[in-house]
Amino acid sequence: MTQSSRTPRRVPLILALVLVGLNLRPSMAAIGPLLTSIRNTIPLSYTVVSLLTMLPVLAMGFAMFRGARLAARWGEHRVIAVALLVIGLASLARLHASTALDLILSAVVAGMGIAIIQSVMPGIIKSRFPNAVALLMGVYVTAIMGGAALAASTSPFIGAWLGDWQHALAAWSALAAVALAAWYAIRGDIVSFDAADTGAALQEESLAARPRAWLLGIFFGLGTASYTCVLAWLPPFYVEQGWSDTHAGLLLAYLTSMEVVSGLVMPALASRHADRRPVLLLVLASVIAGFVGLILAPVAYPVVWAGLLGIGIGGLFPLSLIVAMDHMDAPRRAGQLTAFVQGVGYLIAALSPLIAGFIKDVSSSFTEAWLLLAVVSAGMTFMVQRFRPADYPRHFAVRSAPAAAER
């Protein structure tokens, strides 16, 4: 990094980071609690509803591959500012949404803005907080989960207060405006990576040739599949059990609040040791237990199952990125790897709401979808065994320019 002429203002920087993170899920998390109201206005099958989560996540996957290049060309601060503006405008456009296409297009545009931010922010964290990467990633991801909890819990009330679901969805543009103002205020504390770091960075093409990059991407994608599926379908699942939209939304908010807690606690636990595998296995066990509970006794102990899922998913998301960042020392290289990992991962995760929606349309039940996710999570425990820190250097060794030229 090119160092600033003055010491970075840590508190404003962390505050801005939190405000930015809060904006990365409301565009998706607000849909589920409002789904009944939306379907009363716009007739939608469950398969079509799944597109409201699938397509923005798919857009996130493709846009992730461009984030690092845009940041290298225009600068990290400017790129994130523009992405926040895109998210805010996409949310505001929902004020006039009257068709499924309107909702889908706004979700896709917001997803692209979200992807750009998520592809760039890990590199900023690694460069500005090199000795506290796990803790600050926990704070950042906690903010993301907190935004989801905030949207899930308050959107039905906002809709009742403002009169309809369109206003409830559009209201989240105000949060983007606040984050944009805070991000602009710390523009002097976000400096661009220097040429040496850029030259040493792995390019996307070389990452695609690294099996470990794909393993990390697949692991992230399978874990995120649980998140996207729960985000899209947990409220409708409990509405079918006889719950109101408001109560189902509050359950999702509770789940995401547990994600917030786990997003802080699990990275803090993992930061004590270079080997993150024990904590990864712990959160995967929590995810599996939560899905098994939804299958066997969804109505008897909903708070327990939602809590277990929240703890597991909330810890798995940041830990997956932390493990990826552990493989790289240079901030830009770490940022490029996490962008690649998230790009691959979101392309995988985008399919889970669609698959669950299709299962629901065919079988009239979400049970098979929860079972599939439990099996996938169990399979991930075997992947965790390969994340041994001593093996990291050999997976991403960078050849020197002369050595590369001799080949």
Walk through the language-model features, giving the residues of each:
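Helix-to-loop junctions at the C-terminal end of transmembrane segments
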Residues: 63-75, 262-275
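Helix-breaking motifs and short loop linkers at transmembrane-helix boundaries and internal kinks
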Residues: 43, 75, 96-101, 130, ...
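Conserved MFS/SLC helix-loop-helix module at the cytosolic interface between two early adjacent transmembrane helices
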Residues: 62-101
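Extracytoplasmic gate region of multi-pass secondary transporters
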Residues: 31-32, 211-263
